[in-house]
């Protein structure tokens, strides 16, 4: 496996997994042309050229999230009920995926924890404007208060991302794992399907508990549990944790 793609729900350990694969296989971590929605600010011809350049790399590990590939512009509702990307994006997604040797799907079942983590990361991102202390280490561990208005939008966005992840049919995964099964040490190499396993020191740098860094944590968590028990159709969610979901569109047929 020389070209590995991680397709993941948000806040699900992709930074760690990229680092693990990088150290196990000695292949570079390379951002895709879709990184952080940059792709939606350039025309399709330029994006196609960037994808061709990316695909020419001999070996690499990369990651994407559903909202990078399947844009929703400014309307969460438009994204929530979208069943496939717009016609301009479809060929570009296929152009990207056809060169991957191996695609790993990663899903975090505790969707409430995902939403709280995403809300905190996005809140800190907007405070700094440069990404510091937001979506990647080093984390900003200052205690903040997140407005309920912003959090409601975050809940809608996370639900939309999960729904599109399992509804889309363009990304097929050779293996699907759950964030909750990761041990964050060398043994995860076997879990994600690597044949090469080395004993390496964990690169994980834990952030402080969300209960400590979000001043109104209890209020937000209570809202999220109620939200996800009502506002969803494609998954069974109990106390904020997904207990059943249809992954047939994600699985690659052997």
Where on the chain are the PLM-derived regions?
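PAPS-dependent sulfotransferase catalytic core
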Residues: 1-65, 200
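A periodicity- and composition-biased signal for non-globular, repetitive helical segments
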Residues: 17, 69, 211-214
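A general secondary-structure boundary signal
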Residues: 28-34, 100, 176-178, 239, ...
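PAPS-dependent sulfotransferases, especially Golgi type II membrane carbohydrate sulfotransferases
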Residues: 3, 136-169, 182-254
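Short alpha-helical segments used as structural interaction elements across diverse proteins
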Residues: 8, 57-60, 105, 205-207, ...
């Amino acid at each position: 496996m020389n070209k590995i793609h991680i397709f993941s729900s948000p806040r699900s350990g992709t930074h760690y997994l990229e680092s693990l694969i990088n150290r196990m296989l000695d292949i570079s971590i390379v951002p895709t042309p879709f990184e952080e929605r940059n792709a939606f600010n350039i025309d399709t011809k330029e994006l196609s050229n960037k994808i061709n350049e990316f695909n020419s790399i001999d070996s690499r590990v990369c990651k994407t999230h559903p909202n990078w590939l399947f844009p929703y512009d400014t309307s969460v509702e438009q994204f929530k009920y979208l069943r496939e990307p717009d016609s301009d994006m479809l060929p570009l997604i296929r152009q990207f995926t056809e060169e991957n040797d191996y695609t790993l799907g990663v899903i975090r079942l505790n969707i409430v924890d995902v939403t709280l983590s995403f809300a905190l990361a996005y809140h800190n991102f907007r405070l700094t404007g440069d990404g510091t202390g937001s979506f990647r280490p080093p984390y900003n561990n200052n205690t903040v208060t997140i407005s309920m208005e912003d959090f409601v939008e975050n809940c809608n966005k996370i639900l939309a991302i999960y729904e599109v992840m399992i509804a889309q049919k363009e990304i097929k995964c050779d293996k699907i794992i759950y964030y909750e099964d990761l041990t964050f040490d060398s043994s995860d190499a076997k879990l994600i399907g690597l044949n090469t396993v080395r004993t390496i020191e964990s690169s994980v740098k834990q952030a402080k508990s969300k209960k400590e860094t979000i001043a109104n944590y209890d209020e937000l968590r209570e809202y999220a549990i109620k939200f996800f028990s009502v506002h969803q159709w494609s998954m069974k969610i109990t106390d904020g944790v997904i207990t059943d979901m249809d992954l047939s569109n994600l699985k690659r047929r052997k």
